[in-house]
Structure formats: C-alpha cells, structure tokens
Design a protein with these regions (language model features):
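Beta1/beta-strand and adjacent pyrophosphate-binding region of the FAD-binding site
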Residues: 1-9
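Conserved N-terminal glycine-rich FAD pyrophosphate-binding loop of Rossmann-like flavoproteins
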Residues: 33-53
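C-terminal helical "tail/cap" subdomain of flavin- and related membrane-associated enzymes
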Residues: 311-402
C-alpha cells in the first residue's frame, strides 16, 4: 500500500513515521520549508500522551524541550478563585506535559532517525488531488507539477485544508466568540513565579499566562472575532493585565513589561467536516475538525486521530493485499470511531468558554466571586477539576473494535 500524507504537523508526521516503521511506503509532503512555527499547540494531556504510546513514539526524546505543567490557576478581578496542582488525578498520575512542537517534529523527522520507507519533502505544496477513471482519489499533484500516485491520500493539512476543499467536502462551522492574540516575552524576562497556566478574568478582558516548554513566557488575550486588532503599546497591554492580576503576577508583569513582544493574531475556527473520507482519501486532525484553543485539544485530538488511523491501517495491511473496497471500509471505521469523541470535546470546549464569557460579561458575578474567593476556593477548584476529566482523557478507546 502506497500512502501520501499532506501536512507535516503532529498528526501527519506521527502517522507517517508509525506507518513507515511498520513497513508501509509513505511520502510526507509539507508546504512550509521548515517545521519551526510560532505559537503552536504544545500541551499534551494524558489523552495525547496515550496516543504517543499507541503510535510507538513515547517517550518524547530528552533532547526535546519539555516540562510538566505545574498546575492551573484562575483569578477573577485580581483575586485567586482557585489553584489546582498537576497532575489533577493525584500523585503518580500523568501530568499535562508541555512539549516544544517544532523541536519534537524536527526530532521525529530527522534524517538520521527516519524510517527507510518514509520519504519527506519540505517546501513542496500540494496543488490538487488526482483521480483514476472510476473517480477514486489516486494521488496528489504538487505545485511544481510533480505527481505522487497513492493507494491512500491522507489530508493532515490543517484547518484551511486544501485537500478538503479540492474534495468538495463541506466544513460545518460552529460559531466561536473569540479570536486570540498571542504574545511572547523575550528571553531576558525573569522566570514566572508560578509555573502553571494562569487564566485572568476581569473588566479588561480574558487572558492567560504560562511558561512554554522552551522556557519563554507566553500571553494569550481574547478578543471578539472580526474585531480590529487593538493598537496598544507594550506598556498599555501590561497595564491592562496588571489591573486584573493577583499581586505576585502583577509585580512580575510590571518588572518585565519591557520584554513583551508584538502580538500575533490567531483567528479561531471550530467545525466538523461533513465526512472525513472519500474513496482513496482520508482527512485527519484540523483538516477534519478544527478545534478551539480551549484546553489544548487540537494537538491531542490530532494525535489520537493518528493513533487510531495507524492501528486500523496496519491491521488491514497485515492481512495481505488490500482491495479498494477494504480500504474504504477501513476509512469509514476510522471516522466512525473518532467523530463522536471529537464532537463531544468540541461541545465541552464550548461549555468551558461559555463559563469564562459569563464571568467576562457579568461584572456583579465577578465581584461576588472575587469577594468570596477565600470561602469558595476549595469548592470551585473541586468543581473545575471534575469538569476537566473528559477534556484530559478523551472519551473513546483508541481502537475500532475490529
């Protein structure tokens, strides 16, 4: 079986390596000339770590920058509502782990580590799908005219998926109330006093602060979708944050405000493709289901897609020559196994964001929670912890039951 995978993000790269290690001939193409992209998802929940195990890609090499997240903190009007340490499930459980995505991809696809059956082409953009006389997808045509024949084409080319559009597969989008501005503090900034993920809710807006796997402090700021990007100076952004940050974080922001970089806007898109496959074509990751940034589900769901697809396709190939009908049945099983979990987690993400939006737009509720924070902190933390279980562990096994 010849497989062409378009898109060398976590889903495409992981699937390519897993299939090639097992003896499948795989060609992986990526439009970008390199794998280093800013502000990419790096938080691996237990669900994503499980997927890496299933793919045979665990543990992440020690040479890749990584660290266990310290915990989760939510502050309202400058007062800590709750703080919950990782791992949420208690000592000995898997914590949320931050992994540098560019470094991990570089390690995964390094020439010296690459499986013999894997061919990687960076800086080569896909331009169209090829079809045989029966209308079945039979390969990919690149922008330079190169044709890559395949028994199976896998689209892992992101939320704006060219392959999804070329296959005329509609994306059913869900309204989403935010876009996100991402900032990074330069390397000269001090270490944060708290090594967890902090969410700030107040009259200035909804923001988050954390230290990345590579040790750089990052800041996310939510804005309405379609709204103009605010033209604030670094000092003005810092002042807005300080106005609703707890004392320790406010002090850090004031001391390190000069190190804040310019924002990069991330337009949030959430949706489900009407179907994830056609004869000879499979869509995975954001190409099939762009996710909200809430609780870092994009990378985790993409890896779970790759894990289940790898298991299903390798089981099929191990039984001998694969017919077109058998392959299509396998593609249908992959979608049937993965779609319910993705749809449910998108709904859970929306609920999580709705709670934050409620606080954002109800000043009286923020003031009430801030005033009674010492009294309600433990109960709020327990409730929040319970709400996270499915977002952390997923809801479906990583097999098709075949």
């Amino acid at each position: 079986m010849r497989v062409v995978i378009v898109g060398a993000g976590p889903c495409g790269a992981a699937l390519a390596v897993a299939l090639a290690r097992a003896g499948t001939a795989v060609t992986l193409v990526e439009a970008a000339p390199g794998l280093g992209r800013s502000f990419r998802g790096e938080a691996l929940m237990p669900s994503g770590l499980e997927a890496l195990e299933r793919l045979g890609l665990a543990p992440v090499p020690e040479t890749v920058p990584q660290r266990a997240l310290g915990g989760w903190r939510v502050a309202v009007e400058g007062h800590d509502l709750f703080q919950v340490p990782e791992p949420l499930e208690g000592p000995g459980a898997q914590p949320c782990t931050l992994v540098s995505q560019p470094a991990w991809l570089e390690s995964l696809l390094a020439v010296t580590q690459r499986p013999a059956r894997l061919s990687v082409h960076l800086g080569m953009a896909a331009a169209d799908l090829q079809h045989n006389a029966e209308g079945r997808v039979s390969g990919v045509q690149l922008a330079d005219g190169t044709q890559l024949p395949a028994d199976l084409v896998v689209g892992c080319d992101g939320r704006g998926s060219l392959l999804r559009r070329k296959a005329d597969i509609a994306l059913s989008e869900t309204a989403h109330p935010i876009d996100v501005l991402w900032f990074r503090f330069d390397a000269a900034a001090e270490a944060l006093p708290d090594q967890g993920f902090t969410t700030l809710v107040g009259p200035q807006g909804l923001a988050s602060v954390f230290t990345s796997a590579e040790g750089r402090v990052q800041l996310g700021w939510a804005i309405p979708p379609g709204a103009p990007t605010p033209r604030h100076t670094a000092r003005e952004w810092i002042d807005r944050l300080v106005a609703q940050a707890p004392q320790d974080l406010a002090g850090w922001l004031q001391r390190n405000g000069a190190h804040l970089g310019e924002p990069v806007r991330f337009s949030v898109q959430v949706g489900l493709a009407e179907r994830w496959w056609q004869p000879g074509l499979l869509l995975l990751g954001d190409a099939a289901h762009p996710m909200s940034p809430v609780r870092a589900q994009g990378i985790n769901m993409a890896l779970r897609d790759a894990a289940l697809a790898s298991c299903t396709l390798l089981e099929l190939a191990s039984a001998g020559p694969v017919s077109a009908a058998q392959l299509d049945q396998a593609l249908a099983r992959i979608e049937a196994a993965r779609r319910p979990e993705v749809a449910l987690l998108q709904a859970l993400q929306a609920e999580e964001l709705e709670r934050a939006e409620l606080l954002q737009h109800k000043p009286w509720l923020r003031r009430l929670l801030a005033g009674f924070a010492p009294l309600v902190s433990k109960a709020a933390g327990r409730y929040w912890r319970l709400q996270q279980r499915r977002l952390r562990h997923g809801t479906a096994p990583l097999d098709t039951g075949q």
